[in-house]
């Protein structure tokens, strides 16, 4: 089966928005053992849409078309598909009734423009959209099925998961015996990870892939077939052993997610004091429902004055050692923990750049501390200075990993291949 994707919209083509839908779809299909062969982005011009539908339908077996199903004049996917096939648009009565029902239920008058969303190519098969007003549909053109979905990410994800994946499994008799194990890593580059894993002799049906999403690199271990699935846990365990401290989570998208589920319902509490990370640690945890059960407070103490007045950092500590120092960050963590008597507190202070570095403390220098009821762990690390965002996100990841290792009763301070450390 040859799978392709067509993304529509001038704002996507012009780079005004990042096409996260395409990235999500490709990743999701890989998890089902299906690789996208080609992705095309086209603007909101009728003749361009018609041409790309006609041309790609000669080569693909299934094409997911994303976007252009709204009620406005620049939403032209349905019209373009009808013209590409040489047939009229006709009203789908079922979807019109669904639209009227939706607006009535929400106590709103339906604009006439929304009726456009019930107009589908004559040969189209309606595809339900349970969470929006844009009607999905599929049409056979040349050798391909074209499967139309709205550009709203939430709606796309529902339709792909609930309708697209089951359709292609039935239509193309895909083998459902596919399993995937994900290992999340920090502190090593993709090439360094590959150098360690490429020499491994993998069982038949097992393959390894890499996905860089800084500050993490995700290792995907695919198993295709019953025999490969049976040995997947053993293979994953061996890969973890080979990579050592680089592996920080299994089957989680981020370290924040790993920390969230370790603290959720644990009865333990966490406070955070952030300088260079600017609320990133706290924000990433708040993304998850239920974080209020363990997260007591997150403070952004960016100035020296706030470190002193809010966290109780001794002014002489700042004078003697500076804001970016082991001494200061330890006092920040202790102060954050003591405010509400939390079980744990994380603190960060660093130089994210691009300015502010010195010979002694260059850009990328970050001090991180973890305060516990039994004491304080701290380190000052040297991070790659490629960008301000990378310094901040890597700082948050190392802080999370310190807490993760403490929760597992492991050594809190460990070496990462691509992250240096200052001696205390």
From Swiss-Prot:
Taxonomic source organism: Shewanella baltica (strain OS195)
Q: Which CDD domains match?
A: cinA (cd00885)
Signal peptide extent:
none
Q: Matching SUPFAM superfamilies, A to Z?
A: CinA-like, Molybdenum cofactor biosynthesis proteins
Its taxonomic placement starts with: Bacteria, Pseudomonadati, Pseudomonadota, Gammaproteobacteria, Alteromonadales
The family note in this entry says:
Belongs to the CinA family.
Task: Tell me what this protein is called.
Answer: CinA-like protein
Which Gene3D superfamilies does the UniProt entry name for this protein? Answer: 3.30.70.2860, CinA-like, MoaB/Mog-like domain
Which Pfam families does the UniProt entry name for this protein? CinA, MoCF_biosynth
Return the InterPro entries for the record: CinA, CinA-like_C, CinA_C, Competence-induced_CinA, MoaB/Mog-like_dom_sf, MoaB/Mog_dom
């Amino acid at each position: 089966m040859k799978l392709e994707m067509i993304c529509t919209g001038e704002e996507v083509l012009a780079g005004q928005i990042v096409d996260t839908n395409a990235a999500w779809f490709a990743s999701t299909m890989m998890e089902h053992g299906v690789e996208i062969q080609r992705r095309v982005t086209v603007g909101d011009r009728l003749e361009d849409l018609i041409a790309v539908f006609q041309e790609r339908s000669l080569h693909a077996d299934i094409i997911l078309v994303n976007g252009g199903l709204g009620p406005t004049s620049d939403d032209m996917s349905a019209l373009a598909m009808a013209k590409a096939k040489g047939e009229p648009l006709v009203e789908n009565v079922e979807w019109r009734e669904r639209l009227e029902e939706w607006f009535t239920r929400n106590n709103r008058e339906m604009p006439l423009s929304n009726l456009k969303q019930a107009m589908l190519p004559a040969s189209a098969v309606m595809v339900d959209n349970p969470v929006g007003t844009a009607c999905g549909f599929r049409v056979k053109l040349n050798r391909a099925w074209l499967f139309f979905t709205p550009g709203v990410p939430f709606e796309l994800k529902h339709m792909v998961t609930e309708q697209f994946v089951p359709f292609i499994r039935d239509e193309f008799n895909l083998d459902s015996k596919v399993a995937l194990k994900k290992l999340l890593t920090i502190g090593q580059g993709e090439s360094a990870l590959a150098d360690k894993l490429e020499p491994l002799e993998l069982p038949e049906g097992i393959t390894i892939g890499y996905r860089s999403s800084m500050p993490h690199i995700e290792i995907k271990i695919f198993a295709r077939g019953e025999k490969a699935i049976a040995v997947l846990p053993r293979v994953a365990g061996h890969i973890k052993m080979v990579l050592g401290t680089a592996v920080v989570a299994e089957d989680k998208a981020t370290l924040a997610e790993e920390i969230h589920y370790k603290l959720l319902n644990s009865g333990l509490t966490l406070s955070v004091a952030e300088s260079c990370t600017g609320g990133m640690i706290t924000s990433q945890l708040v993304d998850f429902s239920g974080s209020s059960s363990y997260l007591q407070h997150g403070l952004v103490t960016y100035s020296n004055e706030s470190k002193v007045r809010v966290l109780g950092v001794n002014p002489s500590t700042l004078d003697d050692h500076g804001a970016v120092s082991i001494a200061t960050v330890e006092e920040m963590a202790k102060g954050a923990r003591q405010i509400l008597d939390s079980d744990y507190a994380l603190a960060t202070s660093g130089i994210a750049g691009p300015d502010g570095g010195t010979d002694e403390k260059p850009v990328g220098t970050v001090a991180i501390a973890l305060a516990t009821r039994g004491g304080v762990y701290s380190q000052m690390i040297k991070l790659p200075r490629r960008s301000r965002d990378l310094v901040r996100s890597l700082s948050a990841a190392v802080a999370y990993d310190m807490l993760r290792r403490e929760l597992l009763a492991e050594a809190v301070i460990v070496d990462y291949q691509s992250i240096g450390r200052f001696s205390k």
